[in-house]
Regions:
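The Walker A/P-loop phosphate-binding site
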Residues: 2-125, 143-147, 158-159
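Conserved, well-folded catalytic cores of nucleic-acid-processing
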Residues: 43-50, 75, 87-95, 116-121, ...
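Short linear loop/turn motifs
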Residues: 56-62, 127-136, 339-356
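Short hinge/gating elements
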Residues: 69-74, 198-207, 309-316, 359
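Conserved inter-motif catalytic segment of the P-loop NTP-binding fold
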Residues: 91, 95-205
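A structural signal for short, well-ordered beta-strand segments and their strand-loop junctions
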Residues: 102, 182-183, 232-234, 274, ...
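Phosphate-binding/switch region of NTP-binding enzymes
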Residues: 206-333
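Terminal-proximal interaction/regulatory segments of ATP-powered molecular machines
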Residues: 341-416
Length: 416
């Protein structure tokens, strides 16, 4: 059945007459950028159903949505900056004009450590990574993002690429190559007059700093989508100093916890990730590394239901391990059987291993395939959970639309 609205057609025609792109442009179809950590990518992903007269298929759109803000929250030492850098590197590395702009208000790691986490060669690091750790304030941080935005949207012919994906109607999706901005951290960001010698005890109080940063977030958000800038905002979970317990700023923050910098940074985030570290790991046992178990919880998401968490493994030497994190996911979903040095995946009891040697075992192609197949099986359950069929014609005909029936009955009564 073909649908047509005279008002919609007339409205679009009037907008076209303005010749103003800001008036003409409509919402762009979202594209996900994998972070390299598949458990998170899938819990934040969606299934896209492409349906045209000639073809019909579904694909997984996983990872961080283009042109969005992601808040990373957690206590000190839980791995927020490490994970953010690794995710950022995995997003931009495949692109010729990919770029990371890192604002390090809390000083930062050595360049060699950052390059290791980004998994970049020395040449890539120099070409794609821009950082500063002095002279940062609210005003010039905005100016730098605005410059990035203007450079990209005014030179689309340089930065635009074919994603290779289609929207639900089969139209090819084109995007500007992604740029990642990292602010580390919001709690340390202050206005220029305060950083350049203003009196802390003067008119600029903690509350007014939060208000200025709130305006910053509101000004930056509209710039992100059109330029495909992904903004990672690192923030802390701090104890609430209030003597009277009050409702948490957002669900899945506990009573007595707060995030500094104002509530707008929470409400306007496309994703809010809570990072919680737990038990330590030692090289002489466990997984054969010195590190820690970490849970990543999707506190807020505009693509999937919130509250879902996945396990990850932080290796103190190399950062978060994609492979060990997948292994932790398989354990959580009870795909690892056996005990001690005689573990096996699923029903593959002919391929036994010790978890301390799991990384070595993955070098065996046959074992790697078993591992990947089991991982895909679990990941598919993560992306399917909370995803609904958007094709109206194919929705379950056993579902009864009570609301429509009641409204129709009311209209019938009025007509009689």
């Amino acid at each position: 059945m073909a649908f047509k609205s005279a008002l919609v057609d007339s409205f679009r025609g009037e907008m076209a007459k303005t010749k103003d792109p800001t008036m003409i442009n409509e919402s762009q179809f979202d594209v996900g950028y994998p972070t390299g950590y598949l458990a998170f990518d899938f819990i934040n992903g969606t299934k896209v159903e492409v349906r045209t007269e000639k073809t019909s298929y579904t694909y997984n759109s996983i990872g961080i949505v283009d042109g969005t803000m992601v808040s990373m929250i957690g206590r000190a030492g839980c791995g927020k900056t490490t994970l953010t850098l690794q995710m950022a590197g995995n997003i931009v590395r495949p692109f010729e004009n990919g770029m990371i702009m890192h604002e390090e208000l809390e000083t930062g790691s050595a360049s060699t450590r950052k390059r290791q986490l980004l998994r970049m060669t020395e040449e890539e690091f120099k070409a794609k990574y821009v950082s500063r750790n002095t002279g940062i304030n609210t005003e010039n941080f905005f100016e730098r993002i605005k410059t990035l935005h203007d450079l990209k949207v005014n030179n689309r012919e340089i930065y635009e690429y074919d994603t290779g994906l289609c929207d639900t109607q089969g139209n090819r999706i084109f995007k500007l190559q992604p740029t990642v901005v990292i602010l580390d951290s919001l709690a340390m960001l202050m206005p220029r007059d305060l950083t350049e010698g203003g009196e802390i005890a003067g008119s600029m109080t903690i509350t007014s700093v939060a208000k200025v940063n709130t305006q910053l977030v509101k000004r930056i958000i509209p710039l992100l989508k059109s330029a495909n800038i992904i903004w990672f905002m690192i923030n802390h979970i701090l104890p609430d100093p209030s003597p009277i317990p009050k409702k948490a700023q957002v669900a899945w923050l506990k009573i007595g916890e707060r995030c500094p910098g104002g509530e707008t940074a929470i409400y306007l985030a496309n994703n809010l990730l809570r990072i919680d570290d737990s038990s330590k790991l030692s090289a002489d046992k466990d997984l054969g590394i010195n590190g820690i178990n970490v849970d990543i919880q999707l506190v807020k998401s505009r693509t999937k239901r919130p509250g879902v968490s996945v396990p990850m493994i932080l290796d103190y030497d190399t950062g978060f391990s994609p492979e060990l994190s997948l292994y932790a996911l398989l354990k959580k979903h009870k795909k690892i059987n056996g005990a001690g040095a005689y573990l096996y995946i699923g029903d593959h009891s002919d391929h036994k291993f010790s978890q301390k040697n799991i990384l070595k075992e993955l070098k065996d192609p046959e074992f790697a395939k078993i591992f990947m197949d089991a991982s895909f099986e679990v990941l598919e359950t993560l992306i399917s959970s909370g995803t609904t069929n958007t094709n109206i014609e194919e929705q379950d005909d056993t579902v009864v639309d009570i609301t429509s029936m009641m409204l129709s009955s009311m209209m019938d009564q009025m007509a009689s």
